[in-house]
Amino acid sequence: MARKLSVILILTFALSVTNPLHELKAAAFPQTTEKISPNWESGINVDLAISTRQYHLQQLFYRYGENNSLSVEGFRKLLQNIGIDKIKRIHIHHDHDHHSDHEHHSDHERHSDHEHHSEHEHHSDHDHHSHHNHAASGKNKRKALCPDHDSDSSGKDPRNSQGKGAHRPEHASGRRNVKDSVSASEVTSTVYNTVSEGTHFLETIETPRPGKLFPKDVSSSTPPSVTSKSRVSRLAGRKTNESVSEPRKGFMYSRNTNENPQECFNASKLLTSHGMGIQVPLNATEFNYLCPAIINQIDARSCLIHTSEKKAEIPPKTYSLQIAWVGGFIAISIISFLSLLGVILVPLMNRVFFKFLLSFLVALAVGTLSGDAFLHLLPHSHASHHHSHSHEEPAMEMKRGPLFSHLSSQNIEESAYFDSTWKGLTALGGLYFMFLVEHVLTLIKQFKDKKKKNQKKPENDDDVEIKKQLSKYESQLSTNEEKVDTDDRTEGYLRADSQEPSHFDSQQPAVLEEEEVMIAHAHPQEVYNEYVPRGCKNKCHSHFHDTLGQSDDLIHHHHDYHHILHHHHHQNHHPHSHSQRYSREELKDAGVATLAWMVIMGDGLHNFSDGLAIGAAFTEGLSSGLSTSVAVFCHELPHELGDFAVLLKAGMTVKQAVLYNALSAMLAYLGMATGIFIGHYAENVSMWIFALTAGLFMYVALVDMVPEMLHNDASDHGCSRWGYFFLQNAGMLLGFGIMLLISIFEHKIVFRINF
């Protein structure tokens, strides 16, 4: 970096020394430039280049000069400020290879930001620039290095092609060996001599003499080029003219330059501001126009933003706060309303269609919850690049200009964000792969067991006859015990049914199974004769038939059957594990008030955590809140269905169940408000909320819902397990796809909203 700066300064002031009289003549006769400019090389606006260069020179002279001239002391201050007054020893432990790819950045501000990254907290950033000022070791060496600096963008001009090939390796090796070859005193004295010469010619411009670095005949060799070079002498030759003093009073040359920093130009902006085409190769003469602008930007630090300035210039979050409140309120309202509408599905709970629907909804919830955790919540909790991008972008644009924000900020942020997105998608791929493996292995095992069972044939006619007799005996036994069972249930277990609403009549077969589980625990031996036919009358008849003849294993068979019945009861009546597992008798004894309190507290705490996640997500941005809201909605629907089933079995009416669920949903609004306040007013707390929410989502998805998907009771209803398998895969992949689309187009959603 110091090598470039040395070349820029030497070339600028050396060229200004070689032809001062011609510049005075050009200033006295401005019509000369107008006549020659049409003959200038196509693609370059000479007038604009001259005026822009004049502006930057006046900025430098106003900053360091007095009476329209630059003294030795002022020039020394300029060199010290940009960090090339002498060689300084610093210890920075980082890889220097990044200096060899300047063309990758293609703009001054990114390289300048990287060079000054370690000095943002103090004002001694000259040391860092001096790390690269080893190019100032000799005068002859400086002459060839100015076009070499621009070899990245030109590469076609013969004057520039000399140093193009060796630019990067020599630049890197020169930094390593400079301490052995050049002493600090030599470079300091050389720069001081250059300062003395340049300043002397500026002050005594009436009697110019050529500098040591350039020949005398430069001014007479190419008149068109020389006429177009309005360098420092144009400013110095007008000491008595008001053309210099008037701009100093204007808004461009006010003393408030530091308060209103200049725009940070990249390579394209520098060329266009000087009237040069982006595709036009630069030679040394044309590059001379750019030198004052480059030096002015380095000196004014237009491309640096200090930490204190960032915090001071960040605009208030009024816009994002409004979006957070509106979006969070709408999201919570939609989720609560649609979840309450799930009560219309309660009458369908005993139908096969409901099993398919619930299986798909659970799989969709798994996909959205895990997708939101891996693709959105965890990436945002690990890195705050999106958070800083959304809030710091106005300040960055004020400081650096819209072109820089579009070219650098967008590309870097998108590449970093997509990297975390693909890693999260890889984690989801591992999760889905293990789900497929476990599910497919289970299906294969069940298929083999079914095949072995079908292959078992009766060996002789005696076995067939025995089975027929056992079947007759079973039917007679069930008929005889039916009366006793009716009397017992009338006196005991069904006494509470007379007090229930009529809408529970359709659920009595399911309740009988619950009661039989309780009976089996209390009296395993006494009620065995009535327990078997009643429980196995419809669903477990074949299992009982296969083992009933084995009189030696009756007790063992009883325990096996009890396990199967209890497992079937759990799967049949609690398709989603959010709902509490209570028998009907327990629900009745508990009372409506106690159960309502349990639902409000248990389900309300869950809704509060969901609202907290939604509120914090909307403070991050609209797309963040959208993805979290979709994930919450997809797992709230089956969750609310389970809660409705529990409340209705407790004896509540539909209106009461809706009311208590609505009360628990109110806690979601409280959680949303808490999340918005924390995310907006607390520093970086929303990142911790995202991490906590990701853990909650993954627990609900992987611990609660995935086991329900793996252990479904499709075969008990005569349904194909493969049909369930494909339906569950469709739900999971749909959830993954929704979260992936939101994650990929998240930055575009924010961009459109901002405009």
Curated annotation (Swiss-Prot):
The modification Phosphoserine is found at S471, S478. One of its GO terms (cellular component) is endoplasmic reticulum. The chain crosses the membrane at residues 326-346, 356-376, 424-444, 658-678, 687-707, 725-745. Residues 129-144 have a biased composition (Basic residues). Keywords: Cell membrane, Cell projection, Coiled coil, Glycoprotein, Ion transport, Membrane, Phosphoprotein, Signal, Transmembrane, Transmembrane helix, Transport, Zinc, Zinc transport. Induction: Up-regulated by estrogen in breast cancer cells lines. Decreased protein level in response to zinc treatment. Increased upon T cell activation. Induced by STAT3. Residues 219-234 have a biased composition (Low complexity). Belongs to the ZIP transporter (TC 2.A.5) family. Interacts with SLC39A10; which triggers cells to undergo EMT and mitosis. Found in a complex with SLC39A6, SLC39A10 and with the 'Ser-727' phosphorylated form of STAT3 throughout mitosis. Found in a complex with SLC39A6, SLC39A10 and with NCAM1; this complex controls NCAM1 phosphorylation and integration into focal adhesion complexes during epithelial-to-mesenchymal transition (EMT). Found in a complex with SLC39A6, SLC39A10 and with GSK3B that controls NCAM1 phosphorylation. Zinc-influx transporter which plays a role in zinc homeostasis and in the induction of epithelial-to-mesenchymal transition (EMT). When associated with SLC39A10, the heterodimer formed by SLC39A10 and SLC39A6 mediates cellular zinc uptake to trigger cells to undergo epithelial- to-mesenchymal transition (EMT). The SLC39A10-SLC39A6 heterodimer also controls NCAM1 phosphorylation and its integration into focal adhesion complexes during EMT. Zinc influx inactivates GSK3B, enabling unphosphorylated SNAI1 in the nucleus to down-regulate adherence genes such as CDH1, causing loss of cell adherence. This is Zinc transporter ZIP6. It comes from Homo sapiens.
